[in-house]
Amino acid sequence: MVSKRRVLREMVVKLFFQREFRHNEFEEIFSETLNKIRDNTIKADFKRYVEGVFHNLSTIDNIISNHLINWSFDRLSYLERNVLRVGTYELIYEENIPIEVTINEMIEIAKKYGSEESGKFVNGILDRIAKEHAPKEKFNL
């Protein structure tokens, strides 16, 4: 059975993936998705994640860019880019989620919608980001 938190992460990744193609309709897509969510806890978490990623997007993108080896941010697939964005947000800003959980979940989402290679790529990048940017308290969760 898939956890509610996995569903939440997938929804946020999908929303930012859609943003790549429908940039001008982001608020509309966000509102439509939010209105479809029945569980109030998931709804609140979804809103917090989306707003957190969106408001910290340039910082998150810079962090990701700085951890790409022999690769540029623009070369990332839309899927990998947005999985990394959500994963980076969660590593840095969601205090009570263990690093290993975040990385594992993002690997699984990357593999589900991409490929085995996407999962390996996401693992390497998020691991480097966690070591340098995750709050020190998260290493003890």
From Swiss-Prot:
CDD domains registered for this protein in UniProt: Terminator_NusB
GO molecular function: RNA binding
Keywords assigned by UniProt, alphabetized: RNA-binding, Transcription, Transcription antitermination, Transcription regulation
One GO CC term, this protein: cytosol
GO terms classed as biological process: DNA-templated transcription termination; transcription antitermination
Record-linked InterPro entries: NusB-like_sf, NusB_fam, NusB_RsmB_TIM44
Homology family: Belongs to the NusB family.
Function recorded in the entry: Involved in transcription antitermination. Required for transcription of ribosomal RNA (rRNA) genes. Binds specifically to the boxA antiterminator sequence of the ribosomal RNA (rrn) operons.
HAMAP family attached to this UniProt entry: NusB
Name the UniProt record assigns to this protein: Transcription antitermination protein NusB
